[in-house]
A protein has these predicted regions:
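Helix-coil modules at protein/domain termini and other flexible surface or pore-lining loops
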Residues: 2-123
């Protein structure tokens, strides 16, 4: 099982635009259809992403645990690539066959349509 955990970050929207452009050049692709990942966030902006778990339930439970706060909730689970994008007021998660596809889906759904990648993983 693999994990990334981060606290609250601040970044300019232009960084998110540059990051999406870089993703188009070398976008990680999911390879493990039988592995699950999940992304969790807390009210204070803390978050965690896990991947390589044998079930969606175990992945979500681990993401919440690694998030580390009582307000942590799993935003999603995925067998491909999962991403959470942020802007000043929102966090939006999505998944897709590549990091680029997942990022586009999250940016299309986040209010305002812009943000930056905060957490991501591909199985």
């Amino acid at each position: 099982m693999d994990t990334k955990s981060f606290g609250r970050r601040v970044a300019a929207a232009s960084v998110g635009i540059l990051a999406v452009g870089a993703i188009e050049i070398a976008s990680p692709t999911a390879h493990a259809a039988l592995s699950y990942g999940s992304i969790a966030y807390a009210d204070n902006g803390a978050g965690a992403v896990v991947w390589n778990y044998p079930s969606s339930r175990e992945a979500q439970k681990a993401a919440i645990q690694y998030c580390g706060w009582s307000s942590c909730e799993a935003l999603n689970y995925f067998t491909d690539c999962g991403v959470a994008v942020r802007n000043d007021t929102h966090v939006q998660s999505a998944h897709g066959p590549t990091l680029g596809a997942a990022t586009r889906a999250a940016l299309n759904a986040i209010p305002g349509g812009n943000g930056y990648i905060d957490l991501w993983a591909c199985n």
